[in-house]
A protein has these predicted regions:
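Sec/Tat signal peptide C-region and signal peptidase I cleavage site
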Residues: 18-24
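Bacterial N-terminal signal peptides that target proteins for export
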Residues: 1-8
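Bacterial N-terminal signal peptides
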Residues: 8-17
Length: 123
């Protein structure tokens, strides 16, 4: 009886950890989406570059937190691409290359993540 209880406790703990991890990735992706939308659509143009810079740093942290998932890489690519647009000029070229690389890295993990957003973003 004790063995069954131990097994059940272990299984329930693993399920809980999986749920927590699933919720963590969902929360992180939701955060990136919401912040991107606020910066892109509601922030005064003169402030966008700095805000996208900060969000790009946060996206990188989230990618490092979930290295086996494509979704954070896709959002990092989208954020870097939009940051490049806000930055403009020659300084944006490096950001564009970096964004493309993130999207290609995401494609290697899961080409269908976020309903194929990789291909929409790559053009």
């Amino acid at each position: 009886m004790l063995k069954i209880h131990t097994i059940m406790t272990t299984v329930m703990s693993l399920l809980l950890v999986g749920t927590v991890n699933a919720n963590a990735i969902d929360d992180d992706i939701s955060y990136l989406q919401k912040e991107w939308a606020i910066i892109n659509y509601e922030t005064v143009e003169d402030n966008r570059e700095d805000k996208f810079y900060v969000l790009a740093k946060k996206a990188k942290e989230i990618v490092e937190k979930h290295p086996d998932r494509a979704e954070p890489l896709i959002w990092e690519g989208i954020i870097l691409s939009t940051y490049a647009g806000a930055k403009g000029g020659l300084g944006a070229l490096g950001l564009i290359k970096e964004a493309r690389n993130r999207l290609l890295d995401a494609e290697k993990i899961n080409p269908n993540a976020l309903s194929g957003s990789i291909y929409t973003s790559l053009g």
